Amino acid sequence: MVDVSDKVETKRTAVAEGRVVMRPETLALVIAGRAGKGDVLGIARVAGIMAAKRTADPKNSKSFSRVLLERPRAHSI
């Protein structure tokens, strides 16, 4: 039989990283918020939060830290 009783709450940490490389002109538009598809960085932030918290699970989004770094010399975010 499987024990399904309450368990002690634990703190867990996960780290994920990704990089999107693009032409310098495209990167400039994305950073300036003038890309033809709208607010690319805003959508990326929301997508990251949704993936991290698995939207069906009740979790407070304040428990997540997210950072988007602009790297113009590498033509990436």
From Swiss-Prot:
It comes from the Bacteria. Pfam families: MoaC. It catalyses: (8S)-3',8-cyclo-7,8-dihydroguanosine 5'-triphosphate = cyclic pyranopterin phosphate + diphosphate. InterPro entries: MoaC_sf, Mopterin_CF_biosynth-C_dom. One of its GO terms (biological process) is Mo-molybdopterin cofactor biosynthetic process. Its EC number is 4.6.1.17. Pathway: Cofactor biosynthesis; molybdopterin biosynthesis. The keyword Glycosyltransferase does not apply. GO terms for molecular function: cyclic pyranopterin monophosphate synthase activity. The keyword Lyase applies. Keywords: Lyase, Molybdenum cofactor biosynthesis. Catalyzes the conversion of (8S)-3',8-cyclo-7,8-dihydroguanosine 5'-triphosphate to cyclic pyranopterin monophosphate (cPMP). Belongs to the MoaC family. Seems to be specific for the biogenesis of DMSO reductase. Homohexamer; trimer of dimers. This is Cyclic pyranopterin monophosphate synthase. The lineage of its organism: Bacteria, Pseudomonadati, Pseudomonadota, Alphaproteobacteria, Rhodobacterales. The gene is moaC.
